[in-house]
Amino acid sequence: MNRIILFLLAFLCIVEAQAQGKHKTVNLTPPRPKVGVVLSGGGAKGAAHIGVLKYLEEIGMPVDYVVGTSMGSIIGGLYAMGYSPDELAQLIANMNWSQYVGNSIDRSAMSEEVRKRSSTMAVNIPFSFNGILNKKEAGNTVSFLPSAYVNNTSLINLFNDLCVGYQKDMDFNDLPIPFACVATDIKTGKEVDIRHGSVPLAMRASMAIPGVFSPVNMDGHLLVDGGLVNNFPADLLQEMGANIIIGVDVSDRDTIHDGEILSLPEVLNGLVDNAVNSKRDDNQAICDIYLAPDITGYGTMSFTHEAIDTLVQRGYQKAKEFREPLMKIKQHLESKSNGPLTKQLRASKARNLADAPVYVSSIVLNQTNQKKSVWLLKKGHLKVNEFLSEKDINHAIDVYRGTGAFDDITYNLTENGIDTIHGTAQETYTLSMNFKPTHPHVFGLGIRYDTEEGAALLLNLGINEKMLSGFKLSLTGKLSYNPKFNITGTYSNLNLGNFSMAYDYRSEHYKAMIFDKSNTNLQYSQHKFSAYASPFRLINFSNTIGISYTATSFDRLTPFDFSNDTINQTLISSVNFQNNNLLSPFIRISYDNRDLNYYAKHGIYTIFKCLFHFDTKGKASTVPELYYSFLGYLTPYNSRFTIIPQVYARCIFKSPTMANLWNIVGGEVASRHFDQQFPFIGIYHTDFVNDLATVLRCDLRYRLFEKHYITATYNFLYGRNLFGKNHSITEDNIYSGVGLQYAYNSFIGPISLTAQWSDYTKQFSAYFSIGYSF
């Protein structure tokens, strides 16, 4: 027994000695010093970071850690996931930053309701009554307003596209290159160093400029741009273990002059730079190499191809100026290494979804019920067990956003493992989409001024308008010389479409050149009740079938002098401008795939309507009506020129005695005084046309500068009397008109000035307008 115990003790001593020997052998060659790179914030100027990284790779400088703030966190985060400097330069230059900053979506993805609102309202504010009441109880009555101009959707999904393989929560030390970034907790005002979690969300938080981008909720913090507290976080590199620190600073220190800060991001960037100067000085002092590339002439929003290329080159040149000290560091590192220095990634490179589709074996839609999930998948054309590309996923997200029902939609892809797909081993993924419903109600405001009608204000309250289905109520009022009011109740069903009932009131005061006489003041008021269904809910195609009851009263008619005109004495007699009541079943079909509401470059907009008008008082016979309009937009080779052919045609198949059914042309705004009114350049006011009226028009538009346009117009009018006696201006003749317009597409709507002439009026006239048409 004693021998056994002695043997075991001896064996343990030998094992311990061997372990100690191995431990001593490992420590004989200590690891080489670690190199960290810190990248400051600075918006588009951060492109200079790419040039520095490119030079470091060219000379063989290893990068063991990367930290960044704001734009530095984006460049640094992508570099840490394995993207090369050349790939980064291409990515940054090709990104449509105006789309991401504006959080815009293509018009083609918008629903008809959202398109209509965006084309008439300058301001739209979603809200909820519960939210207002809760905030009122808390003493804050305005916090239901949006927290920023841009929410999470566009940017976070851009980062998700670039981070496939690293979208899940993780330790950032497990990235190909260990990474960290800085954000600011707006609840405490303190710095938050992000070293774990979701990489895309971390980058999004670090560059969330207050007031421009919405804050990000992350691990109990409400995070905004890290530049508010630490725009050059070299100290964070020290905490991570970097022994040698290379800093790249593209902030505007000592370079801001009068008139240089023009945009909101640049103003905020200037304030941030001044606020964090003291900490930046401390962080600059701990850098072994401090690089400040020349950013003269460029600002936070300089995201043009030329600007990006120049800034990348300037960053490269600045690093090249430090070749000697950088090479000394490299030589020192080589002396501490067992072999030559090479770029080593600790894990595989992130996958760019734009480069290749992924095979999706399952789809999960969060924060939606089963019925809505089925409808959303069908609406977005998403299917399981198929390859989905970046375009497929983001198009679906745009379509979902285009409904107006969601404030935030993000996605992530989770690896499920390898599976055999069509005889080939493929990584399969689960696509998870996260939906954050927006506030259900919306308040809209539109403003307009023009020389025909004067000032106008459009107010709208949409109750439950932002919901996908259920009962919705819309109240709209136009306050102007010609007031209008509409109330519409709609029941929306995801599968069956919309069923609506509406009441409209309008009071019109306008001038008309009746029967080839001088301008005459006319006035009428109208009450209209409608019930209709829209059974199909397609993005570009819509159809409506229903019935309306219209009561029209001509309240005042300026007397005519027709003492020597027996024909027109008869036409202007008691019938034409007397009160009338019409019952009108109708069908309306439209197709609209224009790329923009105003100043479109591509697409068509066409409407077909068929109506039957019954005089409920029995004084007139049934009047059938056909209406057709077409607008096309053609921009050859994406040039500055856009050709816009237009057709307007309407036929009433019995000569009506009611003036409100006659064909009407004139003015620049379609349907201004009557639903059937055609626009015509050269006839400033309105006039009545035959039973068959056709306007052919062609606009040639040239874009001078961004948002500045000049348009030349030629149109002609042909009318023919098919039924009954002639009561129109045209008398089977053709009249033409020409116009020249200058316009600026402002944030409150177009601002335009039009000069026009026609051979009917034989007079020049001018028309000026500001704001959207409504």
Model-based region annotation:
Residues 19-69, 77-398, 402-415, 435-438:
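Patatin-like phospholipase
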Residues 701-735:
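C-terminal hydrophobic structural anchor segments
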Residues 42, 72, 88, 189, ...:
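Buried hydrophobic packing residues in well-ordered domains
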Residues 4-13:
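Sec-dependent N-terminal signal peptides
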Residues 506-508, 550-552, 609-615, 650-654, ...:
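Short glycine-rich beta-strand segments
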Residues 1-4, 19-20:
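Positively charged n-region of N-terminal signal peptides that target proteins for export
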Residues 442-447, 575, 585-705:
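C-terminal outer-membrane beta-barrel translocator/porin domains of Gram-negative envelope proteins
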Residues 390-391, 402, 408-418, 424-587, ...:
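Gram-negative/organellar outer-membrane beta-barrel architecture
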